[in-house]
Amino acid sequence: MFHNMSKIPSYWNKAKKYLSKKDKTMSSLIKKYNSPSETVLTSRKDVFYSLCKSIIGQQISVAAANAVFLKFKKKCKNKINAKTVIKLSTIQLKSCGLSRQKVKGIKNLAQQVLSKEFKPRIITKMSDEDAIIYLSQLRQIGRWSAEMILLFTYNRPNIWPIQDIGLLRAISKNYNKKYLPPESYVSYLNK
C-alpha cells in the first residue's frame, strides 16, 4: 500500500502553463494563487487513510469531519490501517461520532483490504474511469469520493469532478455566472 510520501504532482508546472495559455480566467487565478498555496496539493499516499477520511467526511461540515477524524485517529492510536481498524468494535467506532453506515463502510473497507478483495495497487494501472468504477464498488464510496481519491491521493491529472459543489461555485464566481453552471458548461471548460 502507498504510505506517507507527500509531494506536489510531477505534472503541476506543465499543467499551470497549459491552463494559463488556454484560458484568461485560469491564467489570472494561477497567478493570484501561485505558491505557497500550492502546498495544498501535497497529498498523503495512503489509500486506506484517504478512504477512511473520505467516508468520515461525507455529508457533514469540514469542522465536524475534522473533529470526528481526530477522534477516529486517536482511537486507532495514530495507526490508521486495516489491521488496527478491524480490531475496533462498532461501539468504539461510534464513540468517535461515526454513524452506523459510516462504521459499516470503514469496517467493510478494512475487511476487503485484509482479504485482498480490494487491491489499491492495481488502481495505478487503471484508466481514470475504470479506477472510479473500481473505487465506487466500495461501501460508502460514490463517484465524487472516487474522483477525490484519484485527484488527491493518486494525483491523477485529468480528473474533472463536475458534480463537486466547490468547483461549481468557483466556476460560477470566476466566470461571472449568476447561477451554478449546468453540467454541459462545466464539461465544455474541461476541453
Question: Where are the predicted features?
Answer:
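Intrinsically disordered, low-complexity, charged terminal extensions of DNA damage-control enzymes
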Residues: 1-43
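Alpha-helix initiation and N-capping motif
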Residues: 12, 23-26, 65, 164, ...
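Short helix-loop boundary/capping segments at the starts of domains
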Residues: 25, 35, 57, 61-65, ...
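Long, charge-rich intrinsically disordered scaffolds of nucleic-acid metabolism proteins
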Residues: 46, 51-59, 87
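A short secondary-structure junction motif
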Residues: 53-65, 93-102
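Catalytic cores of DNA base-excision repair glycosylases
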Residues: 73-191
